Protein backbone atom coordinates (compact mmCIF):
# COMPACT_ATOMS: atom_id res chain seq x y z
CA UNK A 1 0.00 0.00 0.00
CA UNK A 2 3.01 2.32 0.16
CA UNK A 3 2.59 2.93 -3.57
CA UNK A 4 -0.83 4.61 -3.23
CA UNK A 5 0.51 8.16 -2.56
CA UNK A 6 2.69 8.00 -5.68
CA UNK A 7 -0.20 6.98 -7.90
CA UNK A 8 -2.57 9.51 -6.31
CA UNK A 9 -0.01 12.23 -6.96
CA UNK A 10 0.31 11.05 -10.55
CA UNK A 11 -3.46 11.11 -11.08
CA UNK A 12 -3.70 14.63 -9.65
CA UNK A 13 -0.75 15.76 -11.77
CA UNK A 14 -2.37 14.43 -14.94
CA UNK A 15 -5.79 15.88 -14.10
CA UNK A 16 -4.38 19.32 -13.29
CA UNK A 17 -2.10 19.52 -16.32
CA UNK A 18 -4.15 17.78 -18.99
CA UNK A 19 -7.71 18.65 -18.01
CA UNK A 20 -10.40 16.77 -19.95
CA UNK A 21 -7.76 14.96 -22.01
CA UNK A 22 -6.68 13.20 -18.82
CA UNK A 23 -9.83 11.06 -18.58
CA UNK A 24 -9.06 8.64 -21.45
CA UNK A 25 -5.54 8.31 -20.04
CA UNK A 26 -6.86 7.56 -16.55
CA UNK A 27 -9.37 5.04 -17.91
CA UNK A 28 -6.65 3.25 -19.88
CA UNK A 29 -4.34 3.26 -16.87
CA UNK A 30 -7.09 1.55 -14.86
CA UNK A 31 -7.73 -0.88 -17.74
CA UNK A 32 -4.01 -1.67 -17.86
CA UNK A 33 -4.00 -2.65 -14.18
CA UNK A 34 -7.25 -4.58 -14.60
CA UNK A 35 -5.93 -6.59 -17.56
CA UNK A 36 -2.53 -7.32 -16.01
CA UNK A 37 -4.11 -8.39 -12.73
CA UNK A 38 -6.83 -10.55 -14.30
CA UNK A 39 -4.51 -12.31 -16.75
CA UNK A 40 -1.93 -12.93 -14.03
CA UNK A 41 -4.32 -14.00 -11.26
CA UNK A 42 -7.12 -15.73 -13.15
CA UNK A 43 -5.45 -17.13 -16.26
CA UNK A 44 -1.74 -17.80 -15.69
CA UNK A 45 -1.70 -18.69 -11.99
CA UNK A 46 -4.34 -21.46 -12.31
CA UNK A 47 -2.83 -22.62 -15.61
CA UNK A 48 0.74 -22.96 -14.32
CA UNK A 49 -0.34 -23.88 -10.76
CA UNK A 50 3.10 -23.29 -9.26
CA UNK A 51 3.26 -23.11 -5.44
CA UNK A 52 4.96 -20.17 -3.78
CA UNK A 53 8.50 -20.74 -2.48
CA UNK A 54 7.22 -20.33 1.08
CA UNK A 55 4.97 -23.39 0.53
CA UNK A 56 7.71 -25.54 -1.02
CA UNK A 57 8.63 -28.26 1.50
CA UNK A 58 12.19 -28.49 0.16
CA UNK A 59 12.74 -24.75 0.60
CA UNK A 60 10.81 -24.18 3.83
CA UNK A 61 13.95 -24.18 6.01
CA UNK A 62 15.77 -21.81 3.64
CA UNK A 63 13.09 -19.16 3.09
CA UNK A 64 12.99 -16.16 5.36
CA UNK A 65 9.42 -15.02 5.17
CA UNK A 66 9.40 -11.35 6.11
CA UNK A 67 5.63 -10.89 6.05
CA UNK A 68 4.94 -13.51 8.67
CA UNK A 69 2.48 -15.35 6.44
CA UNK A 70 2.40 -16.87 2.99
CA UNK A 71 -0.57 -16.41 0.69
CA UNK A 72 -2.37 -19.52 -0.50
CA UNK A 73 -2.58 -18.18 -4.06
CA UNK A 74 -0.24 -19.58 -6.68
CA UNK A 75 3.12 -18.07 -7.54
CA UNK A 76 3.52 -17.73 -11.33
CA UNK A 77 3.19 -14.94 -12.37
CA UNK A 78 3.73 -12.24 -9.80
CA UNK A 79 0.69 -9.99 -9.97
CA UNK A 80 2.64 -7.23 -8.20
CA UNK A 81 5.28 -7.34 -10.95
CA UNK A 82 2.65 -7.51 -13.70
CA UNK A 83 0.63 -4.60 -12.31
CA UNK A 84 3.54 -2.29 -11.55
CA UNK A 85 5.36 -2.99 -14.82
CA UNK A 86 2.09 -2.50 -16.70
CA UNK A 87 1.65 0.89 -15.04
CA UNK A 88 5.34 1.79 -15.37
CA UNK A 89 5.53 1.02 -19.09
CA UNK A 90 2.19 2.71 -19.74
CA UNK A 91 3.35 5.89 -17.99
CA UNK A 92 6.77 5.74 -19.63
CA UNK A 93 5.31 5.40 -23.13
CA UNK A 94 2.57 8.01 -22.72
CA UNK A 95 4.29 10.71 -20.66
CA UNK A 96 7.97 10.47 -21.65
CA UNK A 97 7.76 13.63 -23.79
CA UNK A 98 6.88 15.54 -20.61
CA UNK A 99 9.09 13.76 -18.09
CA UNK A 100 11.98 12.81 -20.42
CA UNK A 101 14.56 10.91 -18.29
CA UNK A 102 12.39 11.17 -15.17
CA UNK A 103 10.09 8.63 -16.85
CA UNK A 104 12.64 5.94 -16.06
CA UNK A 105 11.79 6.36 -12.37
CA UNK A 106 8.49 4.58 -12.99
CA UNK A 107 10.40 1.60 -14.39
CA UNK A 108 12.78 1.70 -11.44
CA UNK A 109 9.76 1.77 -9.13
CA UNK A 110 8.29 -1.30 -10.86
CA UNK A 111 11.63 -3.13 -10.66
CA UNK A 112 11.97 -2.29 -6.96
CA UNK A 113 8.46 -3.52 -6.13
CA UNK A 114 9.12 -6.67 -8.16
CA UNK A 115 12.46 -7.38 -6.48
CA UNK A 116 10.72 -6.92 -3.14
CA UNK A 117 8.49 -9.90 -3.92
CA UNK A 118 11.57 -12.12 -4.16
CA UNK A 119 13.23 -10.50 -1.15
CA UNK A 120 10.29 -11.12 1.18
CA UNK A 121 10.14 -14.77 0.10
CA UNK A 122 6.79 -14.96 -1.70
CA UNK A 123 7.98 -15.35 -5.32
CA UNK A 124 10.69 -17.06 -7.32
CA UNK A 125 12.73 -14.84 -9.68
CA UNK A 126 11.02 -16.35 -12.75
CA UNK A 127 7.61 -15.49 -11.27
CA UNK A 128 8.66 -11.86 -11.15
CA UNK A 129 10.24 -11.99 -14.61
CA UNK A 130 7.05 -13.50 -16.03
CA UNK A 131 4.95 -10.84 -14.33
CA UNK A 132 7.27 -8.09 -15.58
CA UNK A 133 7.02 -9.38 -19.16
CA UNK A 134 3.24 -9.71 -18.96
CA UNK A 135 2.82 -6.24 -17.48
CA UNK A 136 5.27 -4.65 -19.89
CA UNK A 137 3.50 -6.17 -22.89
CA UNK A 138 0.03 -5.09 -21.77
CA UNK A 139 1.26 -1.64 -20.70
CA UNK A 140 2.99 -1.13 -24.04
CA UNK A 141 -0.05 -2.23 -26.08
CA UNK A 142 -2.37 0.02 -24.07
CA UNK A 143 0.03 2.94 -24.50
CA UNK A 144 0.24 2.33 -28.25
CA UNK A 145 -3.53 2.43 -28.50
CA UNK A 146 -4.01 5.57 -26.44
CA UNK A 147 -1.14 7.40 -28.16
CA UNK A 148 -2.80 6.79 -31.54
CA UNK A 149 -6.43 7.23 -30.52
CA UNK A 150 -6.15 10.01 -27.92
CA UNK A 151 -3.06 12.14 -28.57
CA UNK A 152 -1.86 13.58 -25.31
CA UNK A 153 -0.72 17.18 -25.04
CA UNK A 154 -0.86 19.66 -22.22
CA UNK A 155 -1.53 23.39 -22.41
CA UNK A 156 0.36 23.76 -19.11
CA UNK A 157 3.51 21.74 -19.76
CA UNK A 158 5.67 22.10 -22.86
CA UNK A 159 7.15 18.81 -24.12
CA UNK A 160 10.85 18.38 -23.37
CA UNK A 161 13.00 18.69 -26.50
CA UNK A 162 15.82 16.23 -27.15
Language-model segments: which ranges?
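Membrane-embedded catalytic cores of phosphoryl/pyrophosphoryl-handling enzymes
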Residues: 18, 64-162
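Transmembrane alpha-helix/helix-exit interface in multi-pass inner-membrane proteins
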Residues: 34-54
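The first (N-terminal) embedded transmembrane alpha-helix
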Residues: 1-9
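Interfacial juxtamembrane loops and adjacent helix segments
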Residues: 53-67
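Interfacial segments of alpha-helical transmembrane regions
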Residues: 11-39
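Membrane-embedded glycan transfer/ligation machinery
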Residues: 4-5, 41, 82-85
Amino acid sequence: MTWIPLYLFLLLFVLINFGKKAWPWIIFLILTVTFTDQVSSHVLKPLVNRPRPCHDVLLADHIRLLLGYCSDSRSFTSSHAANHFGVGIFIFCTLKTYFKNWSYLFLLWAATVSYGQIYIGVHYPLDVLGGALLGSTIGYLMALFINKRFPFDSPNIPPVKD
